[in-house]
């Protein structure tokens, strides 16, 4: 994301909000990411601008309450502006269903489009892959879904 931002390949004003179970802060994430970002000295100001657009929410994958907190943070970041939301799920397959239900029920943008990207093995076999596809079809339109499978990619 940093490289896309650095090269002005993202629409303005794109903002980023991470969500995971880990108890982290945005500052901690910034420190942990720095060795991998390949920031050149002349890019330091832009790098700081990039991190000013980032936020992080720690929460559970099960239950609605954490997703309500996430949605409140997203709304705060959007500041009542029209906003599109992309949910990039790099999660254990065992939590896909509960997380996608919570996203659908709590975190969808009401005044922009929504997309869900699912990255991971998409099921263990044909039957589990079909079950996940059926679950997602009950929540989202096909044009809202993107699937990235480590094994097929």
UniProtKB/Swiss-Prot annotation:
Keyword terms: Carbohydrate metabolism, Cytoplasm, Glucose metabolism, NADP, Oxidoreductase
GO BP: any one term: pentose-phosphate shunt, oxidative branch
A GO molecular-function descriptor: glucose-6-phosphate dehydrogenase activity
Catalytic activity: D-glucose 6-phosphate + NADP(+) = 6-phospho-D-glucono-1,5-lactone + NADPH + H(+)
Gene Ontology, cellular component aspect: cytosol
E.C. numbers: 1.1.1.49
Top-rank taxon: Eukaryota
Pathway: Carbohydrate degradation; pentose phosphate pathway; D-ribulose 5-phosphate from D-glucose 6-phosphate (oxidative stage): step 1/3
Annotated NADP(+) binding sites: 21, 120
Subcellular location: Cytoplasm, Cytosol
SUPFAM superfamilies with a match to the protein in the record: NAD(P)-binding Rossmann-fold domains
Pfam families for the chain: G6PD_N
Top EC group: oxidoreductase
Keyword NADP recorded: yes
Residues reported to bind D-glucose 6-phosphate: 120
Function noted in UniProt: Cytosolic glucose-6-phosphate dehydrogenase that catalyzes the first and rate-limiting step of the oxidative branch within the pentose phosphate pathway/shunt, an alternative route to glycolysis for the dissimilation of carbohydrates and a major source of reducing power and metabolic intermediates for fatty acid and nucleic acid biosynthetic processes.
Family designation: Belongs to the glucose-6-phosphate dehydrogenase family.
Protein name (database record): Glucose-6-phosphate 1-dehydrogenase
Species in which this protein is naturally found: Drosophila simulans (Fruit fly)
Organism taxonomic ancestry: Eukaryota, Metazoa, Ecdysozoa, Arthropoda, Hexapoda
């Amino acid at each position: 994301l940093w490289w896309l931002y650095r090269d002005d390949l993202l629409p303005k004003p794109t903002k980023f909000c991470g969500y995971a179970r880990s108890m982290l802060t945005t500052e901690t994430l910034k420190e942990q990411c720095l060795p991998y970002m390949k920031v050149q000295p002349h890019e330091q100001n832009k790098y700081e601008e990039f991190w000013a657009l980032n936020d992080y929410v720690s929460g559970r994958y099960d239950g609605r309450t954490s997703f309500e907190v996430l949605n409140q943070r997203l709304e705060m970041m959007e500041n009542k502006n029209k906003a599109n939301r992309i949910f990039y799920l790099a999660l254990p397959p065992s939590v896909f269903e509960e997380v996608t239900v919570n996203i659908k029920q709590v975190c969808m943008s009401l005044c922009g489009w929504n997309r869900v990207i699912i990255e991971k093995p998409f099921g263990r076999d044909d039957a589990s892959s079909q079950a996940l596809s059926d679950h997602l079809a009950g929540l989202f339109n096909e044009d809202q879904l993107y699937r990235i499978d480590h094994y097929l990619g």
